[in-house]
Amino acid sequence: MASGEGILTDGQWKKLEIATHNSGSLSSSPKSHTLFADLNIKSPTGGKGPVAGIPNRHVRRTHSGKHIRVKKEGAGGKGTWGKLLDTDDGDSCIDKNDPNYDSGEDAYDGLVDSPVSDPLNDYKKSVVSIIDEYFSTGDVKVAASDLRELGSSEYHPYFTKRLVSMAMDRHDKEKEMASVLLSALYADVILPDQIRDGFIRLLRSVDDLAVDILDAVNVLALFIARAIVDEILPPVFLVRSKKILPESCKGFQVIVTAEKSYLSAPHHAELVEKKWGGSTHTTVEETKKKISEILKEYVENGDTYEACRCIRELGVSFFHHEVVKRALVLAMDSPTAESLVLKLLKETAEEGLISSSQMVKGFFRVAESLDDLALDIPSAKKLFDSIVPKAISGGWLDDSFKITSDQDGEKSSQDGKLRQYKKDTVNIIQEYFLSDDIPELIRSLQDLGAPEYNPVFLKRLITLALDRKNREKEMASVLLSALHMELFSTEDFINGFIMLLESAEDTALDIMDASNELALFLARAVIDDVLAPLNLEDISTKLPPKSTGTETVRSARSLISARHAGERLLRSWGGGTGWIVEDAKDKISKLLEEYETGGVTSEACQCIRDLGMPFFNHEVVKKALVMAMEKQNDRLLNLLEECFGEGLITTNQMTKGFGRVNDSLDDLSLDIPNAKEKFELYASHAMDNGWILPEFGISATQ
């Protein structure tokens, strides 16, 4: 190959070196071609062949005959405009010595290319890695530790959703592992509410999941059933989910499948736990059984070291609260074992085998179940109260437990009579929901002989109804009307509702729409004359200003003040036997017309009874009085007398009916000229026979 030295002169070589060194500072204008013009480069071949040292494909000749070097990127070069928005130096920076320097540009320096961090995005990426690693290793402790270190606990519902959705598309082994991990993380790493929120999100997205997972409905139903069996979801989750999901969506199908296919079968817990083969992990029930065996063996031989070793080998540090709970129950059930059990718990705490949080959690679980334990161990509460101070003084139970338990103790009466009353009333209410027999319920309450606890009964009645269907809610409202007439005072109702509203926030944890439902109960009580509108003011003054209870009372007032509030509230839960108000009015009119034309009194009374709406009997009174005026037939008063004598229509309902007629006398007089004279005659007769309250005469006169 020929040398380039024979082509260029020494002066030309020097100019070429200078040009190469300063190429970055040259203008990219098409007029800046003077360099190569100055070099005076000519082809020795007359422009017909390549020159040695200058590759042919990088040299082109312009129409003027000048050579121009072209960039390999194809975007021009010296003597061209170059790329759009092209810069000479990718690493260029702002020069403060430049005459055109603008200090404002510094503010943007380094910001243009800086990435924007999204915490949720980062969390999602990290969570997928944690789950994948867990499915590979099966190490619950590492997964729990990684999730705890990740922070961002507010995003944990997403972890629940992601874990289950990833497991749904894998083998049974991963499904079992996912269930085990959720049980491990429950309460310690992920809060119960976050577990519930995660499953709610899954239910709402199951339509999308079903596109990729054909049996998504069945698999998710099994996950929910397993969560309920493992006690990380409450059974009421099914009822609450149905209320917020449309019946047409697959999420609703999931709930129905879980309820009917998995949780209603005999021995469903065992079946659900073995559905995925149990993987390499033991189920919750098996773990509980092993814990019981360890404690039983320990009580027999007293070997603390061996018992600690066995507990450690279980490998369920997240479930140690169950060890604490079962140990305490064993100590209460067998007083001779108490000292050994306390010794074991102290040893596990000092060794760090059972953490402080697990110890407190175990004690809390026992405290919450004392009422049930008392059925088998009568002195359970007394024994438990004696164990707590020993544990705290021994240094293996945190002092915070005593403070909390004392506060709980203030809320729940120490009186054994009250505890027994609560148990008895639950049975009475449940029987009423099955039989719909109000007289029998009233007799049962009278047999209990504890009128001072009437507010407690009211609270328990509505609390149980809140977690049931509309039928039971309507039955509860009807019962309130009956109790107001027969057994309870207005003060009982006020105190009962205050108790309900004080605990409204706690109730809302289990019943999602509790506040709205309580507002309906309050408003319905006013419509049924169980409470007066002024009573709502009395209730409100006894509640904290910005509490959930106060908001509920405000909602009740809004419901009452709405147009046609009476009819709407009477229909809110179906109106007793399911009739709407207009149907009931039509039935009443027909039975009164039939009676007026020669019907039998006993038959008319039976028809009124069959309506099943004692809270609406004031409508019977009103229509009977108006019909008597229109027909000029006082025979209808005989029916009212018979109804009052049988207790079918109470004094309150009778008074309310007369009051409604009194309020509409001006309108009635347009069609019935002697309406006022007739009404005064009927009212006088009612007063003489004790049908209506004495106060009615004063208000009617006014």
UniProtKB/Swiss-Prot annotation:
Q: Where is this motif: Nuclear localization signal 1?
A: 273-280
Q: Which coarse location class describes where this protein primarily resides?
A: nucleus
PTM statement from Swiss-Prot or TrEMBL: Phosphorylation by S6 kinases (e.g. S6K1 and S6K2) is modulated by cellular energy status and TOR activity.
Q: Which InterPro entries match?
A: ARM-type_fold, Initiation_fac_eIF4g_MI, PDCD4
Record's subcellular location: Nucleus; Cytoplasm, Cytosol
Q: Give the superkingdom in one word.
A: Eukaryota
SMART domains for the chain: MA3
Q: Where is this region: Disordered?
A: 39-66
Signal peptide location: none
Where on this chain is Nuclear localization signal 2 (motif)? 458-465
Summary of subunit composition and partner proteins:
Binds to EIF4A1, S6K1 and S6K2. The association with ribosomes is modulated by cellular energy status and TOR activity.
Q: What is this protein called?
A: MA3 DOMAIN-CONTAINING TRANSLATION REGULATORY FACTOR 1
Classification from the root reads: Eukaryota, Viridiplantae, Streptophyta, Embryophyta, Tracheophyta
Give the gene that encodes this protein: MRF1
